């Protein structure tokens, strides 16, 4: 349960009009058939009979097969790169299965190389062509600091206590040395 201040702030930050026609694609995965991966990219077919109304989000997706020859060579991840990614992301995925999953995800994203972007200007923001309405920075309710602080898991005096920063994983050599010396 949020206090009145927090609930009011959340209401004020909601968009005035909800998004219309947001496309939900749940099946964005490569289909495996006979140990061969087939790739497809999403395209939009516009109905020219209704030219007056052009939605920003396509109404019906279609899939266009992408030939394996159109994709760049498959990316192979070296053990050194896996080690560096593990330390940066603080995630242990160095198993053969984890590396295989990462290589498949990169291969799926390789389809972006096929898209023709000639003459397309890069965007600074997705919303750069719209006027963004900001609410005035005025206090509508007050004296709710105590209520907000009660929602915090840890506080020191009248401040929220942030959790400690991430502790980096040791390098591969250090991890193997630690495992050799451990009792497990």
Curated annotation (Swiss-Prot):
Transit peptide, start-end: 1-47
Pfam families: GatC
Compartments reported by the entry: Mitochondrion
UniProt entry keywords in alphabetical sequence: ATP-binding, Ligase, Mitochondrion, Nucleotide-binding, Protein biosynthesis, Transit peptide
EC number: 6.3.5.-
Record-stated family: Belongs to the GatC family.
Protein name (database record): Glutamyl-tRNA(Gln) amidotransferase subunit C, mitochondrial
Native organism: Danio rerio
Source lineage: Eukaryota, Metazoa, Chordata, Craniata, Vertebrata
């Amino acid at each position: 349960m949020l206090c009145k201040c927090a609930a009011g702030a959340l209401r004020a930050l909601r968009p005035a009009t909800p998004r219309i026609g947001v496309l939900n694609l749940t099946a964005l995965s490569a289909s495996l058939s006979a140990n061969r991966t087939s790739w497809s990219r999403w395209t939009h077919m516009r109905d020219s009979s209704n030219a007056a109304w052009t939605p920003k989000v396509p109404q019906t997706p279609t899939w266009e097969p992408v030939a394996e020859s159109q994709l760049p060579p498959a990316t192979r991840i070296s053990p050194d790169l896996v080690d560096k990614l593990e330390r940066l992301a603080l995630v242990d995925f160095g198993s053969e299965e984890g590396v295989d999953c990462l290589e498949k995800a990169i291969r799926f994203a390789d389809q972006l190389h096929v898209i023709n972007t000639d003459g397309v200007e890069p965007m600074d923001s997705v919303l750069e062509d719209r006027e963004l309405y900001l609410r005035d920075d005025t206090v509508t309710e007050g004296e709710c600091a105590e209520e907000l602080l009660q929602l915090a898991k840890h506080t020191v005096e009248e401040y929220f206590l942030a959790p400690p920063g991430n502790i980096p994983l040791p390098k591969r050599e250090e991890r193997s040395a630690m495992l050799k010396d451990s009792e497990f």
